[in-house]
């Protein structure tokens, strides 16, 4: 209703009210030249052709033609906000990172929430993992904690990531989401069982972005002032309480408000209802890692809280909406390799792959100088290096300072305090197959002990409701994997699939032939 609008709907009204005492700015071209007429093109006579000297038109049109930048290959649809991280508990015994320097310290942060597989115009309420990335602007440079709303992931080896994402995206011929592709990949990679079970549980469709937890997911390394190191995992638990959408509400909202999550976050912050999350770590010593019953760097598994309890660290608070979405959210770029001294990577194979993949895609999407974009700029540190030039270099390019190292002219020098922790590794160099590294034990615990009976029922209904659209041989492979977790898990899904399959005509397998095939016309007619 026009008389009962939320802050997001009234953004234009509020912008005008904030400038009520000001005169409108004079309209200009991109180069700052005043414009006398923005409504009528320059032509030779009222019915004549336009003139190429109409720079008002060409300036506007040329910029319009270049407004769009490449969409993120994953996490394209997102919401962003800004705030601070405040330390509430001392963990300097574990890490020398300045972000944890003392209780009460506040560090500015930027956060981006997102879905994974959908395009930038897709709905916020799909069943999909949610990205939950946090950028800490520290005095030692930016720290990007590029997490999700799940503590686990579908795969444990980074070489599978492109194929996994392709399977979740659109079919290369039909350009449709394809259940065959989705479930074929999942069924062939049973390490996905844990994340698939989480995804199809009630938490698979969070109620907006404020009511879900966040996780760094990977295993990281913390290093203290003495050079002592431990492994750790990061958790951020919502202070608003966990809330999820029902399947029915999630199906209704894309028609009514496909941007439900963005709107909810914007309105909460605009009305002073600032969302917050409590930040925790789990810690594991190197000795404990050696004796751990499974690979502690396996992204498809969690560390049991009973053995590695959550240690409180601080609070994440979001108290500012973006001033401009494109400038501060679309151009925001997170890079897991942005780690200040005191925080380092572990041998987690997925993390190792992301250390390269993320900055590489940012350079493609935003350009070689993407770290000069204000939202990505480490504004609390002084950038001093030997990198120069490149497209869209809009700072001073470090003036006349030497652009080579080493040099004899008092240019930036390395600092011993930033040296990485010394870690010893040994073993044969080869491609190790991790496909069969106990893919079911933790999933069984999740199914039997974490979920109650009603949640198990909904989980199986959600899985069957999606799996029913895949071919029968793929259904069979998937059900076997669920049965390996627990016979009841597979049996429930199979019973539901039997009902679906009895109602629908028998699955047909279609064969597609490339143009120029040497098949005889008669053979083609039988396809």
Curated annotation (Swiss-Prot):
Keywords (A to Z) from UniProt: Acetylation, Heme, Hydrogen peroxide, Iron, Metal-binding, Mitogen, NADP, Oxidoreductase, Peroxidase, Peroxisome, Phosphoprotein
Disordered: annotated segments: 1-32
Subcellular location: Peroxisome matrix
Residues where N6-succinyllysine is found: 13, 221, 480
Major localisation: other
EC number: 1.11.1.6
Pfam family, one: Catalase-rel
Binding site for NADP(+): 194, 201, 203, 213, 237, 303, 305
Binding site residues for heme: 358
Compositionally biased residues, Basic and acidic residues: 1-22
Motif segment (Microbody targeting signal): 524-527
A molecular function (GO) term: heme binding
Classification via SMART domains: Catalase
Residue positions of the active site: 75, 148
Cofactor(s) listed: heme; NADP(+)
GO cellular component, one term: peroxisome
Similarity annotation: Belongs to the catalase family.
Complexes and interactors: Homotetramer. Interacts (via microbody targeting signal) with PEX5, monomeric form interacts with PEX5, leading to its translocation into peroxisomes.
Role summary: Catalyzes the degradation of hydrogen peroxide (H(2)O(2)) generated by peroxisomal oxidases to water and oxygen, thereby protecting cells from the toxic effects of hydrogen peroxide. Promotes growth of cells including T-cells, B-cells, myeloid leukemia cells, melanoma cells, mastocytoma cells and normal and transformed fibroblast cells.
PANTHER family: CATALASE
Protein name: Catalase
Biological source species: Sus scrofa
Taxonomic lineage: Eukaryota, Metazoa, Chordata, Craniata, Vertebrata
